Structures are given as C-alpha cells and as structure tokens.
C-alpha cells in the first residue's frame, strides 16, 4: 500500500491595525453601516490617486524584524488584475516581484498526539515572504432577494500577506504555526487578531505525494479559514479526499476550494489561477517603496521584547520548562501577569505560579470566556495565595477554594486571601499533637484499611490519608499527615 506524505503551505492575511486604510484616509473601523467608510479612492472614482500609509509600512517592518527576515531596501507595488463585484478598480494593489519582507522563520511547538503515540516536538517553519496589499470589499448575499449587495467599507484595508514555504506535514503542524503567527502579530501590536471579524484568516495549500517522492503533488487551495478548528478540519478532510481520489484512479485538479463547517467538508469554488493569470505589472500611480537603514533602526528601537527571548529568560531566570515558558508567553498579557505574580510572590515560587497559571487560572478563564487581561484576580492577590501555600498556612486544596472566592467576589483588596482565611477559619492544621489525635481516631475507625495496608495493599494507605483529610475538612497539612501515618503504621 502506498504511504502518503502531506505537503502544506499557508498564506495568512493579517489585517494591520492602522486607523486609516493603506492608500486612503478612510477609517478602518469594523462593523459600521455598509459603504459609510469608503472614500473616492476606495470607490475607484476617476481622477483619484493612492497615497501609501506609512503606518502600514512600519508594521510590516516590525514583523520582518521579529522573524529575522530581510527588509527590502526597495520594493514595488503591483496591480493584480481580476474581476470581482467587490473590487471596484478591477485590480488589487499588492506586491509581486519585490515584497517588503523577504524570508524569515517562525519556530512552532507541535503538541503531543497521544492517540497516534506521537510526542510533542519543535519545528522551524521558513517563510517565503510577507507583502503589503489592500483588502477587497465584501459581497452581501442575505437580505437581497435574488441579488447581491456590495459593501466597500473593507476595500482598501491594509493587509500583510504572510506566505510560508510548503514545509508543514500535518494539520497539527499547520495549526501550531497559525497559532504561533497569530500570537506574534498580536504581541507586536500590528494586528488585533480577531478571527471572527476577519482580521486574521488563512488560506491553506494542500497536496499529497508518495513518501520519498521529491516532486510535489497537485495542490488545492482552501480559502478564508477563520478559526484554528476550521483550519485543522479542512486540511484533514482535504488530505483524505485527495488520497481517496488518487487511490481510486482519479486525478487531483488544481483548484480553489471552500470549507463548509456544517458538513465538515471542502467543496470546489473555481479553478485555481496561476500568477500569469493575474497579469501583474507595476502600479504607475505609486512610487517604489524605499526603506533606509535609519527607518529600520527607528522601528527596531520601538520593538517589544519578543516571545522567544522571554521564553528563554523564563527558563534561565525562573527554572520553568521550555514547554511551560511557551505557554506562559502565548500572549503578552499572560507573560506580564506571570512576571507580576512572581515579582510579588518571589522567584522561589515561580514554578508553582507557572503551574497555577496553566491550571486553575486558565481553567477559570475558559469557564468565563475571558482573556487574561480581564482576569478579576490581581497578580498581587494570586501571589499572596501562593505565599500562603509556601509558608504552610493553607493547603493547595484550600488555596483553590480561596482563589475561587476571590474570583467570584471580584475582591479588590490586595490582602483578600488573608481576609478569607481568617473569616472562614481555613488555616492549615500543622500542630503535631492535634494531628496525631485525629489520626488515632481515623485508624481506630478504619481498622479494615489498616489491615489491608499491613497486608501489602498500598491503596489502603491512600484511603487512610483521604479519611484524615476528610476529618480535618481539608485543613490538615498533607505532608505531615503522610509522615505521621507512616510512623504510626510502622
């Protein structure tokens, strides 16, 4: 049986977070009434000329610096010619032969797949280019009986199209790359990353070939995937479709396909064009884009500390694992919150802080559907909870209860943990005499478990610990209970 290799390349459109459009002064606000944010340039009225938005260029430079690419000292804009109702000029202003960002790399963390028995691993994805272009308008098919409405609010919105080499070999790798790219553009402040509003969307080029074959198979492009789940589902379906088609004696056709999330399948949209079909030529209305070293240095000076550098610093400074550091730097807000907690709780509590952020904190955020920057528990409040675990005042179980109380109360006092501990009498029982008395009662009431433990059943010991913790309503120091039980059971 033929073994197949999957080949995936992604083209990602990141909408740049400028106040105005790339070639006009019209606003870029999302959700306005149709055609209220389109000026004569966007409408392609006769006699108007495009003027390049400097802010869009600076955001492209920032991205290029972050991925270690070459910033072209001279790049040009081209007209990409095609007809579509929401493209009033009859062409899109883009970059073709000389893009502003050339090359670069993004390192991704691919999670383990326990079902397939595959461990987690790291991979570097090479980028071909990233170029500036304008977005098209939007066709509206609802509310127009038998007709299509055109909304040109989006026309002219600045995009950075980011293109990878065809180096990804599974949907899992493609999703890991898309998530890493999404986190990076949001981190850099060049894109808000709102996938529901179309600020970040992917086109996936998918093909298959027999393992060991160098020649690429015929690719299909799946357009406008605006969620990581859809990206994964669409690629997996397309891979199955192509393999089944070839094994049944058919041929894969080069085409553009759309993903139907309701049916969880891709369907043909149109035949896929090649570059020559668009008849690219330099836009005569725009001067070449010249970027001097002084401009690059000014942008570099304003760059934030990058996720990769912070990850390494977290590993070196706080002793967290590389994987944990990756999770903690999944967003700038998460990294800042972690460092704020550690600053209050002390570096000695960095690992427990990391575990809490990836565990209880993330769980509560998901439950409430909010991001870390909207968390109702301040870094100082969480730090105090962790300090009380460290100094033995409370157990980890009680700490979870206190954290949940602070969260639900939306408490504002920095000393909320101590207040709740005192009000509810939650201090951990660490007095040896008191614990011994409780353990004696537990042993007397659970003679069967004692016999089973002495007969070699380790599970019985855990049952006794559970009974002791139950007797103290979770307030006993678990480590002391463990030691005292072992001592008494000989």
From Swiss-Prot:
Q: What keywords would UniProt list here?
A: ATP-binding, Ligase, Nucleotide-binding, Protein biosynthesis
According to UniProt, the name of this protein is Aspartyl/glutamyl-tRNA(Asn/Gln) amidotransferase subunit B
An example of a Pfam family matching this protein is: GatB_N
Identify the SMART domains for this entry. GatB_Yqey
The subunit structure is: Heterotrimer of A, B and C subunits.
Function of the molecule: Allows the formation of correctly charged Asn-tRNA(Asn) or Gln-tRNA(Gln) through the transamidation of misacylated Asp-tRNA(Asn) or Glu-tRNA(Gln) in organisms which lack either or both of asparaginyl-tRNA or glutaminyl-tRNA synthetases. The reaction takes place in the presence of glutamine and ATP through an activated phospho-Asp-tRNA(Asn) or phospho-Glu-tRNA(Gln).
Q: What reaction does this enzyme carry out catalytically?
A: L-glutamyl-tRNA(Gln) + L-glutamine + ATP + H2O = L-glutaminyl-tRNA(Gln) + L-glutamate + ADP + phosphate + H(+); L-aspartyl-tRNA(Asn) + L-glutamine + ATP + H2O = L-asparaginyl-tRNA(Asn) + L-glutamate + ADP + phosphate + 2 H(+)
Specify whether Nucleotide-binding is a keyword of the entry: yes
For this protein, the Enzyme Commission number is 6.3.5.-
Organism for this UniProt entry: Burkholderia vietnamiensis (strain G4 / LMG 22486) (Burkholderia cepacia (strain R1808))
A GO BP term here is: translation
What's the family?
Belongs to the GatB/GatE family. GatB subfamily.
**Is this entry keyworded Iron?**
no
Q: What's a single GO MF annotation on this record?
A: ATP binding
At the top level of its lineage, which domain of life is listed?
A: Bacteria
First-level EC class: ligase
